[in-house]
Each structure stands twice: as C-alpha cells, then as structure tokens.
Amino acid sequence: MKIVIAPDSYKESLSASEVAQAIEKGFREIFPDAQYVSVPVADGGEGTVEAMIAATQGAERHAWVTGPLGEKVNASWGISGDGKTAFIEMAAASGLELVPAEKRDPLVTTSRGTGELILQALESGATNIIIGIGGSATNDGGAGMVQALGAKLCDANGNEIGFGGGSLNTLNDIDISGLDPRLKDCVIRVACDVTNPLVGDNGASRIFGPQKGASEAMIVELDNNLSHYAEVIKKALHVDVKDVPGAGAAGGMGAALMAFLGAELKSGIEIVTTALNLEEHIHDCTLVITGEGRIDSQSIHGKVPIGVANVAKKYHKPVIGIAGSLTDDVGVVHQHGIDAVFSVLTSIGTLDEAFRGAYDNICRASRNIAATLAIGMRNAG
C-alpha cells in the first residue's frame, strides 16, 4: 500500500512539511507497514520556496539585497539538492510586507532586489529558476529587476532612470547588451495565476495599485507610465507586452520577465507539481491525501488540493482532502477530483486555538480517516 501525502501549508499555523508529517503520523497508527511518500506542495505563492526545498532535499540560502524602498533586506531563496534549480519568491526581496503601511508608495518602490536574487541563483550555478511573483510592493514594470541584471534603462540624456513606477515616464531607450550572459543558458519559469494585462482598466495599476498604497491620481500616473514603458520595450526589443495576459502581474513584473528574460508564465500549481515530479510519485500509488487550511469553492481556482487532484485523476487514484475548516459550498470540489473532504476541528473555539492545536488535530483526524478505510477494506474481504 503506497500513500502519497501532498498538502499545502495551513496558513499562519503549519508549513506544508509539518502538515504532511502530521497526516503520516495519524495514518501510521492504522497502517504502520504502508509506504508513505511525503510531497509538500505550494501554489506558487507564500511557502513555495520552503516546499520546493523540502521536496528536493535542497537548501535555504540568504542574501542581502535591495529592498522595495532601496534599503538592504536579508532575503531567503532556495536551491534544489542537485544544485540545478533555484527557487525565488519575489515577496522575499520586493514584497509588500517589507514596507510599513504608511510608507507604501508604488511610485518609488523597486523590484531591484528580485533581480539581485536572480543573480545569486546564477552565481550558484543554477540553470533553472522558478520564481513566484505574488505579494509584491512594486509597480515598476520589473524595471528595477532588469537593471540589476545588467540592462540599461536610460532617459533622453543617456542617464539610467531612477527607482519606482514614477520614473518610467522618463524612459527613452533600452540597451540589453549588458544583460548577464548566463541568462541565455537558464530556463526561467514564473508561477503566476494572474491574467491581468499590463495597462488599462484591468491592468496592474488599476487592479493592484491600491493595495500597494496608490491613490487615484497615482493609479492614473502609474498606468500612463507603464503604457509608455511598453511602447519603449516594443521599439527596443520588438516585443509587445501591453495586452499579454499576465503581463500586469506583480506591478508589471510579468511583462519584464517575458520581454527581457524570455520567461514562461504558467499556473503556479502547475509549475510546482511538475517541478516536484508529482506524477512520478502518484502513478503507482494506492491513495492520495492532500489539504490546506480551508477547502471551499475557491479551492478550484489554482489551489493546491485541486492541482494535486488533477494529477491523481490522470491515473484514476482516489483523493482525500484534509482541511482545517470546510465551507457550505465545499461540495464543488467533488466535481474536480477530490472524492472526500474532512475537517480536523473537533470543537468550537477561537482561531488562535485552532492554530495552536492544528498538528494534534490533523494527527487525530488522519488516524480516524485511516481507521475508516481499514474497516471498509476488511468488509470488502
């Protein structure tokens, strides 16, 4: 009996690795001789680096890089056990959480630190880089990132433009001859579940600018600046990014990654499950167990449980979802490959109590799920 355990984290409570450990502990009480394969998963957002490190027997690295406001921040990233693949979260270097609420200003925040993390990955010898671009504080179109990698973004006087989305209107020319040559031999995949274009009513500035501190006037300025930026990119690089789905992700970072680095933007969960070789683990298993902090109707939109279930159903494997909580509309997940769902909560309490007791609750629920399966197996002969 081979059981694949592939959960996401329980946000603010347990990492994906800890959730997997708790599930395995509970199941082992009933099925001590089963083969357990633990594959912590993430959806390309928070926790992706940690999950990828755990699944590839990799290592966490740290680097001092330029933060969103130009200050130095100690950002973490990861490298796979074989040293070939680097894992980067934009939020670690250029994230909104790095900027106090009163200082959030997308006219000045820069993505330079993310470019510096990419340089760290190249220095390590990585030839594959997976980047999660959620949680950014920036609206600079990825300009800071490409400047860190050696591109020259110059104004009419030949001087490099400054930090932030507020400087893009001064851009006159782009020179990529100085881009780090190692990028040509590197495959960059971007975990991105946002399909917004770069500009317009559904663009980066209008949709995501407010959460980054943009006023209405700033949104208009930022959108105009990104439109100008796209025109200069089209003229210099012969790439039209203005209306490409995903170009508006992370304040236009999607556009820069595609135009300057030839990166591929794909669903976060799709990139992660492929990188983790999830199919290889699942194709000959008996049962798949997944989960996250809450399973509900939103889980069908790029979340880990459905991503795992999609892989499992290719091989007609049963899937059980274990969550901290379920909602009234959770039944929709049964149409997307999850056969049964269970909540680990046993009593009414505060959210803090649920967080504190999560590990033990998952163990208990997993043990009881396993016992129920064992009863069914015995009755089936």
UniProtKB/Swiss-Prot annotation:
- Keywords attached to this entry: ATP-binding, Kinase, Nucleotide-binding, Transferase
Q: Which InterPro entries match?
A: Glyc_kinase_flavodox-like_fold, Glycerate_kinase, Glycerate_kinase_RE-like, Glycerate_kinase_sf
The yes or no answer to whether the keyword Nucleotide-binding is present is: yes
The stated induction of this gene product is: In glycerate, glucarate and glycolate-grown cells but not in glucose-grown cells (at protein level).
Q: Does the keyword Metal-binding apply?
A: no
Q: Which family does it belong to?
A: Belongs to the glycerate kinase type-1 family.
What function is annotated for this protein? Catalyzes the transfer of the phosphate group from adenosine triphosphate (ATP) to (R)-glycerate to form (2R)-2-phosphoglycerate, an enzymatic step in (L)-glucarate/galactarate catabolic pathway.
By what name is this protein known?
Answer: Glycerate 2-kinase
